[in-house]
């Protein structure tokens, strides 16, 4: 059978044809009927940055409470039993519902799922039954796909305007860009709106105090004050943690268990993840930041830990929004002391052209073609008190060059660079001692 648009020419086909004004939406609903089962409670999270972390945190909170929970998105499907890699943040409807049915069959009752703008725009999520939705923030991204920023934002808003049923929970970071429009859309849909953050009404953030690589949060919920030792760095992780807590609380969990669970959560893979440090104690972090806003926030998060210089290695993807490239360059120069511009996933584009667009807006930056070479140079340049951020690829285990995916990991490149730096330092010390 072929599912086709109302105006599609299908007379020559020798198989049954089902016409629909919205064939993508129809496919999603057909997939939902075919694979009817899904976890009882499904919470979707959308926004430019933070989706992966919020989904991971919510899964961990539910697990800590004793629920069978999973998360689905950029880093794959994660359950208590293991991980499954996915090709897309939001899979096509047939694949998605096949996974949902499998999770339900395994006994998973609670699922946190990322709702990407592509997935929302292409109606991949339309057949799902949601208990809650969350909004993190909205900044520039995916303008290679969406014709305008407004079109991109409208795709995100579909979650609250169309997919969540009236009465469902909507958790919104009140301090984020776009929050007012999302709140209005949720109220128009008659959703149960819950806002979090300094300007929030459900969870009010009173203060943040840095304690090493942890943060002490003071929050108020339903008239009670709570102190939380969040084991993560960065103000953006505070926002992500509060959104995930708001989802858990709004879906019935008790505040004592939720806020206790936040003290034990682990960051999502490749999200401001500490990899190791040099012999001089200079730490190196890997982060998925691939938008100007995400890069700024990651650098701002690490700045307090750099008593000396803050270094960053990054590039931009090929065949994607070209307008981001100068913005990324400006962001790096404004917030880091040493900037290394290298390759990300060049895809079909000439890598040098991508780097040139970044370098034009990043005076003083160092251009190095090979990503592993750039990481090695940056690591070798670290001195006591320095911090290095390797941004853009995060959890990814491949680099797309042309149409080929070459095995590559920032984690492995950093580990190799750290080992080489230590060996070089040891060799230098040994040579110095022999000449003493």
Residue locations for each model-derived region?
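N-terminal leader/targeting and accessory segments in enzymes
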Residues: 1-29, 33, 169, 177, ...
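Short, basic phosphate-binding NTP loop
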Residues: 1-46, 53-65, 204, 227, ...
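Short loop/edge segments at beta-strand edges and connector loops
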Residues: 4-6, 19-21, 73, 115, ...
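Short, ordered loop/turn segments at secondary-structure junctions
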Residues: 6-8, 74-75, 117-118, 138, ...
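Acidic, Mg2+-coordinating active-site environments of NTP-dependent enzymes
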Residues: 8-14, 121, 130-284, 307, ...
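Phosphate-binding loop of NTP-binding sites
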Residues: 13, 26-174, 178-191, 305-306, ...
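Conserved beta-strand scaffold positions in the cores of enzyme catalytic domains, especially
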Residues: 17-19, 42, 69-71, 133, ...
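ATP-dependent carboxylate-amine ligase
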Residues: 25, 63, 190, 243-436
